[in-house]
Swiss-Prot record:
NDH is composed of at least 16 different subunits, 5 of which are encoded in the nucleus. Its main location: plastid. This is NAD(P)H-quinone oxidoreductase subunit 4L, chloroplastic. Keywords: Chloroplast, Membrane, NAD, NADP, Plastid, Plastoquinone, Quinone, Thylakoid, Translocase, Transmembrane, Transmembrane helix, Transport. NDH shuttles electrons from NAD(P)H:plastoquinone, via FMN and iron-sulfur (Fe-S) centers, to quinones in the photosynthetic chain and possibly in a chloroplast respiratory chain. The immediate electron acceptor for the enzyme in this species is believed to be plastoquinone. Couples the redox reaction to proton translocation, and thus conserves the redox energy in a proton gradient. It is found in: Plastid, Chloroplast thylakoid membrane. Its EC number is 7.1.1.-. InterPro entries: NADH_UbQ_OxRdtase_chain4L/K (IPR001133), NUOK/Mnh_C1-like (IPR039428). GO terms for biological process: ATP synthesis coupled electron transport; photosynthesis, light reaction.
């Protein structure tokens, strides 16, 4: 179970990094960043449950990351919307 979850987290992290590097769209980039954050959350929760099942440090860390990612997504999409209104495009050039 541990290996499968860590491999899935690493795969999601790699997809997010490659999407973030190759993305030229202001809507796709935050989605790739969310994928990276979710991969970190998966690895944190799995590692926390494996190493010390009685402590919930990994789960608490994941909740904080989710809260920060939600705020980042809201701010990022509002900035993208404002730029779209001015430039009529969401491409990053």
């Amino acid at each position: 179970m541990l290996e499968h979850a860590l491999i899935a987290g690493a795969f999601s992290f790699c997809i997010g990094i490659s999407g973030l590097i190759t993305s030229r769209n202001m809507v796709r980039a935050p989605m790739c960043l969310e994928s990276i954050f979710n991969a970190v959350n998966v690895n944190s929760v799995v590692s926390s449950n494996t190493l010390d099942a009685e402590e919930i440090k990994g789960e608490i860390f994941a909740i904080f990351v989710i809260a920060i990612a939600a705020a980042e997504a809201a701010i990022g999409l509002s900035i993208a919307l404002a730029i779209y209104r001015n430039r009529k495009s969401t491409r990053v050039d």
